[in-house]
Swiss-Prot record:
It is found in: Virion; Host nucleus. GO terms for molecular function: RNA binding; structural molecule activity. Residues 1-21 are annotated as: Disordered. The keyword Mitochondrion does not apply. Keywords: Capsid protein, Helical capsid protein, Host nucleus, Host-virus interaction, Ribonucleoprotein, RNA-binding, Viral nucleoprotein, Viral penetration into host nucleus, Virion, Virus entry into host cell. Homomultimerizes to form the nucleocapsid. May bind host exportin-1/XPO1. Binds to viral genomic RNA. Protein-RNA contacts are mediated by a combination of electrostatic interactions between positively charged residues and the phosphate backbone and planar interactions between aromatic side chains and bases. It holds the Pfam family Flu_NP. The keyword Ligase does not apply. Encapsidates the negative strand viral RNA, protecting it from nucleases. The encapsidated genomic RNA is termed the ribonucleoprotein (RNP) and serves as template for transcription and replication. The RNP needs to be localized in the host nucleus to start an infectious cycle, but is too large to diffuse through the nuclear pore complex. NP comprises at least 2 nuclear localization signals that are responsible for the active RNP import into the nucleus through cellular importin alpha/beta pathway. InterPro entries: Flu_NP. GO terms for cellular component: helical viral capsid; host cell; host cell nucleus; ribonucleoprotein complex; viral nucleocapsid. This is Nucleoprotein.
Length: 498
């Protein structure tokens, strides 16, 4: 978190380490993913999964969810105290899909959480390996970001569906730590804060007493995380106002919504990491790859390279398009749900289409879906090029205050122009500049008005051939100027909350 004055790289956040040099970071991230891989292999053995079944992404997700549930301390404590009908709080499980007589069958499995924790620790040299758990949470979050649109959640908190590109990480659990905070979008943080303020408005005791003190500390911490994402002094000053408010109410909600809107042009810095399904790490470990010795990075060539040589399968419903299912998972793997489609298409080497044109539903299969007609296909997760993941938000002048990309939160550090219709956005900023934050609001609006659509973000940055692991020869793509590529626009994707 920027606000504590230590700038750690995402990998350090990911592995819980303090300042390390590049080699140490690569080694500790390598240790983390190899632990995930070893755990996955062990679970496949326990469940007697065939090689093919072990490469099925739905099985991977079930196994990942089991270990996340086994380590969810707060929920486990809650479940112990509130026994629900027919659910054993000490057990966890889910659907495992097996191939029987040329058909896929669903089998519900149940395990002791204690047993799962033992297998996980054993795979991670006896440690709890929280970093590995967070890594799995981020993979699930990235998958949700690519699959669902959070328009309902946005509207409920008084925000606008057009802000969907600010919603990265909106389904991350609270316990995802610093690595989780780094990847949350501005809209996600604003939404969490608004929910908190609304509770305070409705519940007199929310800020009071011993509990209230803890609530207040959490509130200020979230404000600091959000402040650290903004890159202009005026936006940060407004966050100080929100944080220092005696008892936060509607004025603060107004300020937060204003800030969220402003982030459509004055982009926040949001980290992007390629987090892959556990089965991918399992395959690599099983084939004898030594992650710890070789080192690994979530923001460089390594995930691309891993996906080039991994064969992962997915169940496909009768009228789904396997190529579209592949695109969904590819986007999730590279945390590219909010990237410009022109950039994604160039890197992937095949056209990436908007969410509304995908003939595919989510990756997970509901328990009431009929397995009879289920088929399975290979997911095409390879790419033509690779590119470095960014956290800058794509603002142009000195990466500070200027036009970011509307409806896009850049994932890759690749040069692109910023086609956007400023009028549409500025229309949201009519009137209300009075109140305590008036001078900051005026300043923010001034910066937004001077943002030029013809600017170029990530000047001179390009993609790299997969053989160019040291990133020596950038290839700078040229894009069609007037064609902006937002994944979610004009879309009727399923809602996450359904």
């Amino acid at each position: 978190m920027a606000s504590q004055g230590t700038k750690r790289s995402y990998e350090q956040m990911e592995t819980g380490g303090e300042r390390q040099n590049a080699t140490e970071i690569r080694a500790s991230v390598g240790r983390m993913v190899s632990g995930i891989g070893r755990f996955y292999i062990q679970m496949c053995t326990e469940l007697k999964l065939s090689d093919y079944e072990g490469r099925l992404i739905q099985n991977s997700i079930t196994i990942e969810r089991m270990v996340l549930s086994a380590f969810d301390e707060r929920r486990n404590r809650y479940l112990e105290g509130h026994p629900s009908a027919g659910k054993d709080p000490k057990k966890t499980g889910g659907p495992i899909y097996r191939r029987r007589d040329g058909k896929w069958v669903r089998e519900l499995i149940l395990y002791d959480k204690e047993e799962i924790r033992r297998i996980w620790r054993q795979a991670n040299n006896g440690e709890d390996a929280t970093a590995g758990l967070t890594h799995l949470m981020i993979w699930h979050s990235n998958l949700n970001d690519a699959t669902y649109q959070r328009t309902r959640a946005l509207v409920r908190t008084g925000m606008d569906p057009r802000m969907c590109s600010l919603m990265q990480g909106s389904t991350l659990p609270r316990r995802s730590g610093a690595a989780g905070a780094a990847i949350k979008g501005v809209g996600t943080m604003v939404m969490e804060l608004i929910r908190m303020i609304k509770r305070g408005i409705n519940d007199r005791n929310f800020w009071r007493g011993e509990n209230g003190r803890r609530t207040r500390i959490a509130y200020e911490r979230m404000c600091n995380i959000l402040k650290g994402k903004f890159q202009t002094a005026a936006q940060r000053a407004m966050m100080d106002q929100v944080r220092e408010s005696r008892n936060p109410g509607n004025a603060e909600i107004e300020d937060l919504i204003f800030l969220a809107r402003s982030a459509l042009i004055l982009r926040g810095s949001v980290a992007h990491k390629s987090c892959l399904p556990a089965c991918v790490y399992g395959l690599a470990v099983a084939s004898g790859y030594d992650f710890e010795r070789e080192g690994y990075s979530l923001v460089g060539i390594d995930p691309f390279r891993l996906l080039q040589n991994s064969q992962v399968f997915s169940l496909i419903r009768p009228n789904e398009n396997p190529a579209h299912k592949s695109q969904l998972v590819w986007m999730a793997c590279h945390s590219a749900a909010f990237e410009d489609l022109r950039v994604s298409s160039f890197i992937r080497g095949t056209r990436v289409v908007p969410r509304g044109q995908l003939s595919t539903r989510g990756v997970q299969i509901a328990s009431n879906e009929n397995m009879e007609a289920m088929d399975s296909n290979t997911l095409e997760l390879r790419s033509r090029y690779w590119a470095i993941r960014t956290r800058s938000g794509g603002n142009t002048n000195q990466q500070r205050a200027s036009a970011g990309q509307i409806s896009v939160q850049p994932t890759f550090s690749v040069q692109r122009n910023l086609p956007f219709e400023r009028a549409t956005i500025m229309a949201a900023f009519t009137g209300n500049t009075e109140g305590r934050t008036s001078d900051m609001r005026t300043e923010i609006i001034r910066m937004m008005e001077s943002a030029r659509p013809e600017d170029v973000s990530f000047q001179g940055r390009g993609v790299f051939e997969l053989s160019d692991e040291k990133a020596t020869n950038p290839i700078v793509p040229s894009f069609d100027m007037n064609n902006e590529g937002s994944y979610f626009f004009g879309d009727n994707a399923e809602e996450y909350d359904n």
